């Protein structure tokens, strides 16, 4: 590489930093909740980049809070233990034996792995779960299914599958106030002391709402909300999301994701974005470029 080539590369790097400056100012001191999972967690290079990106957010004055999933890791452990899984509407039926495995994997193996990614990048992350500091009080999640023989709705027992009933963010504030990055496993505790497995998207949205976060970033394995031609829709109001649901444009697995985003916005989050976690540096591209790379849902 010639001296002129090096100068050109340096100039391009300086230009990129300069372009990011308005966004760095916009988010200075902001709280950003990031739901981390899917392909972004499973591929080593993306995982390492994620850790560096979260560390960078902290370095430039943003307060990131990470909530992670761990479905593939749970599946692998259950397979090793020869425990069969049953799913209802995408939710894992979780009995007493299985919830112990779920907690071990989510609050143990995966939680410490994610915190480790960030720590190796030079920041200080602390792994916790919803049971710690009374962060998430859960209640049993109920589902019903219509009897095919008639019009009767039958209750389904999902076992120890829960949903947030109350979120107490004092432990989050304590950690961020000490300069630490909270990494939260989606396990909560009921009023009866029982442990509940909770969907990570739901936990991320509930924590973002309780914090009044500036942004919720949902890292997924899709580009965002797509129109009928498969083109990314970069920006949607809640009313526009509801219209796209009604006409079938938003369907399938995207429905619970947009529902989480809508609920977070209604609780006070300024914007919730569905972002393609398969894209390297997805968090930085979403926050520090004009228009971002995902679908922003707002009031």
UniProtKB/Swiss-Prot annotation:
It is an enzyme of class 2 (transferase). Pathway: Amino-acid biosynthesis; L-arginine biosynthesis; N(2)-acetyl-L-ornithine from L-glutamate: step 2/4. Belongs to the acetylglutamate kinase family. ArgB subfamily. It holds the Pfam family AA_kinase. The keyword Cytoplasm applies. Catalyzes the ATP-dependent phosphorylation of N-acetyl-L-glutamate. One of its GO terms (molecular function) is ATP binding. Its EC number is 2.7.2.8. This is Acetylglutamate kinase. GO terms for cellular component: cytoplasm. Substrate binds at residues 70-71, 92, 197. It is found in: Cytoplasm. The keyword S-adenosyl-L-methionine does not apply. Keywords: Amino-acid biosynthesis, Arginine biosynthesis, ATP-binding, Cytoplasm, Kinase, Nucleotide-binding, Transferase. One of its GO terms (biological process) is L-arginine biosynthetic process. The record marks 35, 257 as: Transition state stabilizer. Gene3D superfamilies: Acetylglutamate kinase-like (3.40.1160.10). It catalyses: N-acetyl-L-glutamate + ATP = N-acetyl-L-glutamyl 5-phosphate + ADP.
